[in-house]
Amino acid sequence: MGNLMSLVLVALLFSLSLAVIADTSNDATHVKEEVKPSTEATDAIEAEVEVNDAVVEPQQGLPGGGCRFGCCGGYWWNGLCIYCCRSQAEANEVVKTVEPQKEEAKP
């Protein structure tokens, strides 16, 4: 009787695994139907990233890990700044050059 129960259990597990494999392979045939973002969405994201990147720059490496115009990014575990701010005049100049590109992206 114990052997019969083991055989039934193995058959049940085998049929369950076949059902899972069949379902998975059915899902794999529909992979070609991917959703791609519209160009409007990607243009808006790229413009936003350019504006954000224009304001900050990587750690400038001043002695002691300080930044000349303050810290615009988070602090690392040892207290050093991740991104240093630019001077206000330089940041305004860069933002003005990026803004026309952002307006062109709008339809």
Curated annotation (Swiss-Prot):
Record keyword Signal present: yes
GO terms classed as biological process: seed dormancy process
Keyword annotations of the record: Signal
CC terms in the record's Gene Ontology section: endoplasmic reticulum; extracellular region; vacuole
Signal peptide: 1-19
Protein's job: May be involved in the acquisition of desiccation tolerance during late phase of embryogenesis.
Protein name, per record: Late embryogenesis abundant protein M10
Species this protein is from: Arabidopsis thaliana (Mouse-ear cress)
Gene: M10
